[in-house]
Amino acid sequence: MFSKILVANRGEIAVRVMRACRELGIKTVGVYSSADKRAFHRVYADECYYIGKADPRDSYLNIDRIIEVAKKSGAEAIHPGYGFLAENAEFAERCEEEGIVFIGPSPEVIRIAGSKVRSRESMQRAGVPVIPGSPKIDTVDEAKEWAEKIGYPVAVKASGGGGGIGIVVVNSQEELEEAFRKSKKLGESYFKDSTVYLEKYLARPRHIEVQILADQHGNVIHLGERECSIQRRHQKLIEEAPSPALNEEMREELGKLAVKGAREIGYTNAGTFEFLYENGNFYFLEINSRLQVEHTITEVVTGIDIVKYQIRIAYGEELRHGQEDVAIRGHAIECRINAEDPVNFYPRSGRILHYRSPGGIGIRVDSGIHMGYRIPEEYDSMISKLIAYGETREEAIARMKRALYEYIIEGVETNIPFHFAVLNDEEFVRGNIHTKFVEERNIAEKVKEYLRIFRPIKARLDEIFMESEFTWEEISAIVTAIDAYEQELERGIEERIWQAIFSLGA
């Protein structure tokens, strides 16, 4: 086994990988930018090195500097986490050239996965259904021809795109020329790839993905699916496993499609095959050639540590599980806790003044933040992941709602009220979700109602907790008031909460 691994990332995912290393007895090397001098991953690592300024191009995307640190520290392998260099074929190649193991798939597989056109072609060869669409399109006239074949509405997509960047929905031929040019421009600007193609636009699909593990000895298994339909602007916010839309037969069918696709391209390590599901049909969407943010919920329902498996596979070990050993038990939900305005989703930065994470049975928190930490504006707004497990979906929802009540993050706005609004929506509870759920269910207006109740109560509680001394009677009264707040808020009985809180000052 490796004796030392460098984690080329920051925040909660850096801590997550380091935890797996610690359990395997592997020393860890961390890296940090000027914005992360007081970040938790810096002190959690066995050794940590400064790699540059806050701008990611000077630090977490600086291949030369990261390789330099790996060689200086004696790290035998690099785990890229997600984001930054995780799906960068050039970085994976550079690691190979320097004699450092890249914990992930091969550079060629990363290139296939990173090209929507190439990955679609690979899945078609494997017999995996894809959304009706075109090969790469070079001219507007070609685009018009294919759009007529496919049928409007169509989506013009940048081949190298991700996170919704480079996707333009077109409802008629009159809109196509501008959309074609816009998508090509976005692809070139963001991904240095101006290749575009067309797909039939699915208006209200479910977004379902399959986690796979593949070793270097030809063994490939799947760990079931995750539903990621609760999104805003193509960014996932709530994920769950398993999907409430699938039965066992459908689950097995989808898993086999993902395994077939992985074998077609020679995939190794952990990966995710994403699909859209509409009207009883699965359509391949894309491959994520890295560890997913939401890998946690698969770990919870299978009991399999995906990060440890990444490390073991990269070292050359065979899978310890066959497909028959994988069982889905219970239900798990993940809420991404972001530092952002919960209504318009604009990111927020600032110092965390008070922090208390939730706990209790069935709750997991993956976080890289702490009280006093300043959330930098240079990076993604996600600051932690809250995971709830239950024997049933209903129990998982109940535990998540309870954990959200307990989660205290002060100093910056977060999207916790957004999660309250979604989890209390009757259609979400019924499992009737799709990628347009947030817009169609008018979640933003429901969030505003939660904020109307939260803000004055929170201000009064802050005032109480700023007092320098408490008697035991006052502490007891505060706990009683908070209990009343949590229990009564959901029933909409606001007046009783106010009475309980204001009685403290009497």
Curated annotation (Swiss-Prot):
Pfam family, any one: CPSase_L_D2
Cofactor(s) needed by this chain: Mg(2+); Mn(2+); Co(2+)
PANTHER family, per the entry: BIOTIN CARBOXYLASE, CHLOROPLASTIC, PYRUVATE CARBOXYLASE SUBUNIT A
Involved pathway(s): Carbohydrate biosynthesis; gluconeogenesis
Span of domain ATP-grasp: 120-315
Organism from which the protein derives: Archaeoglobus fulgidus (strain ATCC 49558 / DSM 4304 / JCM 9628 / NBRC 100126 / VC-16)
Subunit structure: Heterooctamer of four A and four B subunits.
Enzyme Commission number, as recorded: 6.4.1.1
UniProt name for this protein: Pyruvate carboxylase subunit A
Annotated binding of ATP, by residue: 116, 199, 234
Biological process, per Gene Ontology: gluconeogenesis
Classification via NCBIfam families: accC, PRK08591.1, PRK08654.1
Active-site residues (renumbered): 290
Catalytic activities: hydrogencarbonate + pyruvate + ATP = oxaloacetate + ADP + phosphate + H(+)
Domain Biotin carboxylation: 1-443
PROSITE patterns linked to this entry: ATP_GRASP, BC, CPSASE_1
Molecular function via GO: ATP binding; metal ion binding; pyruvate carboxylase activity
InterPro entries registered for this protein in UniProt: ACC_Biotin_Carboxylase, Acetyl_CoA_COase_biotin_COase, ATP-grasp, BC-like_N, Biotin_carboxylation_dom, Biotin_COase_C, CbamoylP_synth_lsu-like_ATP-bd, PreATP-grasp_dom_sf
Highest taxon, organism lineage: Archaea
Keyword match ATP-binding: yes
Function: Pyruvate carboxylase catalyzes a 2-step reaction, involving the ATP-dependent carboxylation of the covalently attached biotin in the first step and the transfer of the carboxyl group to pyruvate in the second.
Enzymatic class: ligase
Alphabetically ordered keywords of this record: ATP-binding, Gluconeogenesis, Ligase, Magnesium, Metal-binding, Multifunctional enzyme, Nucleotide-binding, Pyruvate
